[in-house]
Amino acid sequence: MGLEALVPLAMIVAIFLLLVDLMHRHQRWAARYPPGPLPLPGLGNLLHVDFQNTPYCFDQLRRRFGDVFSLQLAWTPVVVLNGLAAVREAMVTRGEDTADRPPAPIYQVLGFGPRSQGVILSRYGPAWREQRRFSVSTLRNLGLGKKSLEQWVTEEAACLCAAFADQAGRPFRPNGLLDKAVSNVIASLTCGRRFEYDDPRFLRLLDLAQEGLKEESGFLREVLNAVPVLPHIPALAGKVLRFQKAFLTQLDELLTEHRMTWDPAQPPRDLTEAFLAKKEKAKGSPESSFNDENLRIVVGNLFLAGMVTTSTTLAWGLLLMILHLDVQRGRRVSPGCPIVGTHVCPVRVQQEIDDVIGQVRRPEMGDQAHMPCTTAVIHEVQHFGDIVPLGVTHMTSRDIEVQGFRIPKGTTLITNLSSVLKDEAVWKKPFRFHPEHFLDAQGHFVKPEAFLPFSAGRRACLGEPLARMELFLFFTSLLQHFSFSVAAGQPRPSHSRVVSFLVTPSPYELCAVPR
């Protein structure tokens, strides 16, 4: 075929692609569609978004276009929701119409399919309801909200304190130990066992989980999801998600070993055994979501979502304690101290721990009601850390209206949770560490309506009760046994952040001195 023959063919292909592009963006011309930057042909707004720091990019776009603005990511229409009013209206008031998830073809390489979508990314329908109901009831049966699970967490907190004590007051980075402790709680729930902190397979699993979450952001990943044909190119999606793929392979080994110890005649000891029991009951039902492929996805969801978010929050908590010694210890800060000044802080974590719990008895969830200052500090750590700035994407299942704008069926929705947690109209000091956000004038704990670190609505994080328990028991146990400080002669760490899918504190070291 000569070049002369290729020219008409190229023109036909170009015209076809332009028509497809116009077909996907025609809704932008509809009345009351949210405003946004002008999309480029084919690419849409892919080049307008900094996927390495999406929250900052969205903040700039919000300043230009308002709380509800639109994007076109290749052929995918997207609406970004900012501020408490828009997020609550979409996720709560119109929750039934916004509870779906958009297609995610990139995850097919991980084994995602019609009957194996896990819980977090599952389409809104019978399979999601089945798995959500199963997860909630199983966690409750395993002791969530009861003394049995609380005992698992307090035992792990004791192991974590022992590992901190092994540092003998020397400077160290706490992140790795925090990851191990939180992951062991998830391992106990899902596999009925805990790992030693130096177990090679355990360390490998944690490394893969950390690297896998980093794959949740980036330009190429967004392109693969926005153009459905691209994930079918051999090895392309596998390369982008290679750490998540390796993580699931490692998880498969643990699940295979666990199956060998499962006795169907005995009550389930953990979530995996409860899932296998459901799978046996569902034999012969082709529509059931209880199958081997979905087991690995469900357990993987719990590991990835439950481990890194909680451990990152604890890492923020310890950093903020060494930067705000008055909040940690409840003492007057010397006039020359650069931390907060010369006032006596009304929030004193260790003083409250000593008054309510003492330094011998282990903390219990029952103590929380009598510890408003500590509870306020933990919530302010979540508020200030703002570790999940963007919620998991939603999709409209019918035409809806939000804040006066018309959003068509099939539109991807992104909730900018950071815009709610940093809303200057709601928070007195949104960009400063200020535990008083969660205390009233009488010193009682209060939770502002704009505190939404776990999102809101039908797809709000199902692990929120577990996360609250872990944060309170781990944080109080550590502050009960140790005083934390910057190592002598080292520069004071900063509040600076590393932004990816999660927002983590910049690497820092601390000293844990037994009290």
Swiss-Prot record:
Glycans are attached at N416. Gene3D superfamilies: Cytochrome P450. InterPro entries: Cyt_P450 (IPR001128), Cyt_P450_CS (IPR017972), Cyt_P450_E_grp-I (IPR002401), Cyt_P450_E_grp-I_CYP2D-like (IPR008069), Cyt_P450_sf (IPR036396), Cytochrome_P450_fam2 (IPR050182). Signal peptide: none annotated. GO terms for molecular function: aromatase activity; heme binding; iron ion binding; oxidoreductase activity, acting on paired donors, with incorporation or reduction of molecular oxygen, reduced flavin or flavoprotein as one donor, and incorporation of one atom of oxygen. Belongs to the cytochrome P450 family. May be responsible for the metabolism of many drugs and environmental chemicals that it oxidizes. It may be involved in the metabolism of codeine to morphine. However, another study could not confirm it. This is Cytochrome P450 2D7. It comes from Homo sapiens.
